[in-house]
Amino acid sequence: MARTTPLERYRNIGICAHVDAGKTTTTERILFYTGLSHKIGETHDGAATMDWMEQEQERGITITSAATTCFWKGMDAQFDAHRINIIDTPGHVDFTIEVERSLRVLDGAVVVLCASSGVQPQTETVWRQANKYEVPRMIFVNKMDRTGADFFAVVDQVKSRLGATPVPIQLPIGAEDGFKGVIDLIKMKAINWNEADQGMTFTYEAIPAELQELADEWRSHLVESAAEATEELMDKYLEGEELSEAEIKEALRQRTLANDIVPMTCGSAFKNKGVQAVLDCVVEYMPAPTQVKQIQGILEDGTEEERPADDKAPFAALAFKIATDPFVGTLTFFRVYSGTVKQGDAVYNPVKSKRERLGRIVQMHSNSREEIKEVFAGDIAAAIGLKDVTTGETLCDPKSIITLERMEFPEPVISVAVEPRTIADQDKMGIALGKLAAEDPSFRVQTDEESGQIIISGMGELHLDILVERMKREFSVECNVGKPQVAYREAIRSTVKVEGKFIRQSGGRGQYGHVWLKLEPMDITDDEAPIYEFVNETVGGSIPKEYVPAVDKGIQEQMSQGVLAGYPLLGVKATLYDGSFHDVDSNEMAFKIAGSLAMKQGALQASPVLLEPVMKVEVLTPEANMGDVVGDLNRRRGMIEGMEDALGGLKQINAQVPLSEMFGYATDLRSATQGRASYSMEFLKYAEASKHVAETIISARAVI
């Protein structure tokens, strides 16, 4: 089977935004206009194609990233068919991991903003993630028909809150109830969509006279932005020559791919206006797989190598999502970066050093499947039946082994205890939790050694609620859920040198391990910094090389148990600088125990402290309620960072608040403001807990 679409006509894009900006509705319209969906699904009817889990349809939010493929030839059929692989990502902050995972494998992103709410907290989070992976992006300002819609205010917010350079390539004609269509600033024509056929057809018309001056002004901004792409264009522009439509588009494309500018369009997905123009922009301004930075990986000998987006190169792909399908079992979504692979081929997973055979390969359309025989560079597909692959692992050609960069996943910040209601639920619960943990790397399962309880941990209350609900729905497991627990951590504040000795010599073969460690605190506020570092500085064979990894292991085991209240220690640099051994009695176990003892004693001497997770909280409230909201945040040990005006006449309060004080906040905020305020929060950092809080927690859980 040969490739049907050339690689330069591929677009791998994500559609991301804040919850409720109209992201899934936009994707539904894309599927409708590209001919994949014969009836438009509305999220408020619970019928959206991309929201295929029952909980998504009930709650009207998107939880998992559904992937789909469609083809587009342009509004005026001006292109050859382009293959667009779309990933619809969740906008709720508890599911940020899904967004991060998608951006890692995408080449471009369409960020959907609400015309009346503008840039919201989750938008900023998504923007930072897209910056991290250098993903070129465009913006679709949706809901232009909503009360309070203001396109130009949103353009200003994109500059001020996202630090981006927006370049509107369309202007709205009217707003709120009077929103009629858009002005195309490149063609300098008005576009009106036909409401009778759900916007399938449209007409180009003259720009309304009252908007001509505004259109001319924004057109000049657009042309100036395009001219900055190259010196030749700038010279042409400065000499007063007109730039052609093709020159403007090519220049905007170059600057978008370099992440210099962000093209902006507008419309109303719900009212079927403006979505086809978004597809045109995806084709014109988003990169093909050949136009992004080539993927880097590490070969078996430790050297780095780039893999080109080319069918002739050796096969290399990244598994970015595992999902359990009720009909076929485990689906492994993967993005092919280079090479091709057929059904039945062997693939190698270098992370687990395992070889597996690719059974069936399917192209996903939301949750329906089409079997395909072969996938090519640039494709996003799903494999059925891979047993040993988890999120973020590489699949490659067994004859050309490479490990692509792994994805980093955040530590969970909230835990609850779950227990099965009946004996029958007990066995099923183990299987269910195992499958859910394989799907979602930000979800952890562990058993509390003291109480024997099963503890599940995740990124927020909604995250855990939905996982418990999925156990009930998909695996028929009924369980009782305990109160939420905060994931505290421990740290040291001073540098110490400490000796660890483990000696047992009472007849026969004994045990002998002796180490000297230097323990130093590390900065844990930096996201990029490691939370543990081990350095071996022993010289002259004071400890044989083969025992050094055992010391490291002993230190890490003790760190996972903590020294104050049983919470893991973070931010320790441990340097092994001396020690001694016994020719007969020394072994790995003895040195592991010696390392563990030294770590425990040293941490207790190094001014240990308790850390608590602190959340970044943003509250949108009417001005009349500001005093109540600020007072309540102060009572919750919150630190108010600032207040600013938000769209829609609201005020935005920015604060840092310990997670332990935020349980039940949604209910309290609703009652304090008669339901008119809303908030969002995301994990910000670990910070030292106050003396009073630390004493309360340590006395309840003392481990010494």
From Swiss-Prot:
Instruction: Name the major location.
Output: cytoplasm
The residues listed in the UniProt record as binding GTP, with positions renumbered to this chain, are 17-24, 88-92, 142-145
| CDD domains according to UniProt | EF-G, EFG_III, EFG_mtEFG1_IV, EFG_mtEFG_C, EFG_mtEFG_II
MF terms in GO = GTP binding; GTPase activity; guanosine tetraphosphate binding; translation elongation factor activity
Q: Kindly give the PANTHER family that the UniProt entry links to this protein.
A: RIBOSOME-RELEASING FACTOR 2, MITOCHONDRIAL (PTHR43261:SF1), TRANSLATION ELONGATION FACTOR G-RELATED (PTHR43261)
Which NCBIfam families does this entry report, sorted A to Z?
EF-G, PRK12740.1-5, small_GTP
- Protein family membership: Belongs to the TRAFAC class translation factor GTPase superfamily. Classic translation factor GTPase family. EF-G/EF-2 subfamily.
Tell me what this protein is called: Elongation factor G 1
Species of origin reads: Pseudoalteromonas translucida (strain TAC 125)
- Source organism phylogeny: Bacteria, Pseudomonadati, Pseudomonadota, Gammaproteobacteria, Alteromonadales
Encoded by which gene? fusA1
